[in-house]
């Protein structure tokens, strides 16, 4: 004879949530496309480029300054959403010396965006080629978190959060004296 298993009420919800998120994660992984060798080769090339770009003294200094300031005063994602495409603040991020450098690097159309972020995930500089970044602060997003830790590339193709193009997210840490102080984030086109 089998006994029924009774769980204390304090365990029921956490267990159900665990099962739900396990199934959701598995379903999400099933939808992601694995990397074809040609895409993997492109990702490897651009990871190497991002490492070099992230070490540029202008980039390192811009991130260092943003960390010192704490990002743009009073900026948050809700306020960021309200900014128009021609807002002076957005133009400043694009037309600063580091923004111009990032824009020049993004002219290579294999990458769909290029964003520089400080240690808190705040946008430091961006290219205007791919349009306004969707988030001012992306500290909670995997590309930023993984880039800061040195886990540099996703292993699957998914629609990009900003451009909606099929791509592979890549991010590298911006280092100062061997310590990660920010992230240079891009997406390698898979189209």
Residue ranges and their predicted role:
Residues 80-83, 89, 104-148:
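Extracellular/periplasmic ligand-sensing ectodomains of membrane signal-transduction proteins
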Residues 128-183:
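Extracytoplasmic/periplasmic ligand-binding sensor regions of membrane-associated signaling proteins
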Residues 12-26:
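Bacterial N-terminal signal peptides
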Residues 36-43, 91-95, 136-137:
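Solvent-exposed, acidic/flexible segments
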Residues 186-191:
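Helix-start (N-cap) segments at beta->loop->alpha junctions
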Residues 94-103:
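Short amphipathic alpha-helical segments
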């Amino acid at each position: 004879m089998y006994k029924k298993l009774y769980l204390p009420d304090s365990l029921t919800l956490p267990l159900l949530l665990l099962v739900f998120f396990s199934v959701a994660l598995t379903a999400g992984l099933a939808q992601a496309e694995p990397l074809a060798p040609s895409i993997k080769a492109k990702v490897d090339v651009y990871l190497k480029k991002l490492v070099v770009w992230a070490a540029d003294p202008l980039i390192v200094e811009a991130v260092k300054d943003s960390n010192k300031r704490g990002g743009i005063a009073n900026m948050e994602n809700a306020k960021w959403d309200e900014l128009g495409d021609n807002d002076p603040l957005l133009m400043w991020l694009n037309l600063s010396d580091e923004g111009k450098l990032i824009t020049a690097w993004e002219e290579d159309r294999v990458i769909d965006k290029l964003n520089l972020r400080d240690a808190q995930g705040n946008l430091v500089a961006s290219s205007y080629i791919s349009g306004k970044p969707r988030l001012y602060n992306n500290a909670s997003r995997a590309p930023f978190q993984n880039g800061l830790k040195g886990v540099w590339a996703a292993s699957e193709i998914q629609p990009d959060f900003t451009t909606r193009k099929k791509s592979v997210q890549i991010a590298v840490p911006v280092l100062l004296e061997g310590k990660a102080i920010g992230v240079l984030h891009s997406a390698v086109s898979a189209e």
